[in-house]
Amino acid sequence: MSKVGTSDSKNTLYCSFCGKSQHEVRKLIAGPTVFICDECVELCMDIIREENKSSLVKSRDGIPTPKEICKVLDDYVIGQGHAKKVLSVAVHNHYKRLNHQTKHNDVELAKSNILLIGPTGSGKTLLAQTLARILDVPFTMADATTLTEAGYVGEDVENIILKLLQAADYNVERAQRGIVYIDEIDKISRKSDNPSITRDVSGEGVQQALLKIMEGTVASVPPQGGRKHPQQEFLQVDTTNILFICGGAFAGLEKIISARGRSTSIGFAAQVLAPEDRRTGEIFRHVEPEDLLKYGLIPEFVGRLPVVATLEDLDEASLKKILTDPKNALVKQYQRLFEMENIELTFADEALGAVARKAIERKTGARGLRSILESILLETMFDLPGLEGVEEVVISREVVDGTARPLYIYADRSDRAAESSASA
């Protein structure tokens, strides 16, 4: 908007809000007396979205409806419609129970903790994180593989509550309404059918230790963390109203479910699909408590997780959406990196499909998308800072398959020929 002293740039326009020139941004929108760039418009949209989210949480006595929760989950998590419905209803009922437990004393509503079962990279952790963000409650994550029974080397179960307290800035009241997500819960399954063979301090022992805090107890938490020791003051945290969400890939559970299905489907009319003919996520939909018991979870622990949400394998269409649709989508992140070099990065639609298929072949789900893109763009990102005149880099399906190099388009339109074609 303002003019610069040099004759070369006296007609350069600037954003009235951030001060960037028209050459530093994609778009500069003119008003009667001001200019605003596309980046500032995006920032304004983010602020409005955050305001809308906070107003959503404050509506209806602080409890968004299941449909409202599910709608916000759709903005962050691609696919998994069934799991979103299960989670939305469970979380809505949980916080409705908290808000009304002092109003009606005739019927006591029990807490419903949640178990998420799904393949690697299907969105279990992201769902739990997004729920906490929607509800504006303290949230912490714990890795079940690091937990051991009290008195053994490893992390005490009560340290989970300490982390939640830290997330709540040591506000005990807020922490007591928070959400705890315990990942890799399948890794603490019982290591043997006979629990008396050895002392299983990281398997069944951890399940036993988790029982109390999941059901509801007053945990004595050391304020500075670590092991308890005498002459130490403890913080008392009631875990009765803390929502526990446990997640795991449960590798091998599909075989247990399929075996149970085969035993009940016999006769000439029975249609039995081989395990390889069905996707893991589809098989998980038929999970029963008895399957979890056979997997190695103890009956008391399964009883503390009455709500089970199963996630399906992400198909090619879902993985393509994950690459491009979310606000912090991977493709947008790499495009931003290239923009810093004043170069446009373009992915052909067939290239995105090829990336998605690679992730499916590797069975890494959404988690494996970044490593695939990193390997595709490695040579380009290595060479790019030293290349002169490159205006655009195009990634085709052949580049993803490894049969061609990225197409470099130069600013001089008479020489659009690329450094590309064929290699292998």
Curated annotation (Swiss-Prot):
InterPro entries: AAA+_ATPase (IPR003593), ATP-dep_Clp_protease_ClpX (IPR050052), ATPase_AAA_core (IPR003959), Clp_ATPase_C (IPR019489), Clp_protease_ATP-bd_su_ClpX (IPR004487), ClpX_bact (IPR046425), P-loop_NTPase (IPR027417), Znf_CppX_C4 (IPR010603). One of its GO terms (molecular function) is zinc ion binding. CDD domains: RecA-like_ClpX. ATP binds at residues 119-126. Transmembrane segments: none annotated. The keyword Cytoplasm does not apply. ATP-dependent specificity component of the Clp protease. It directs the protease to specific substrates. Can perform chaperone functions in the absence of ClpP. This is ATP-dependent Clp protease ATP-binding subunit ClpX. It comes from Rhodopseudomonas palustris (strain BisB5). The gene is clpX.
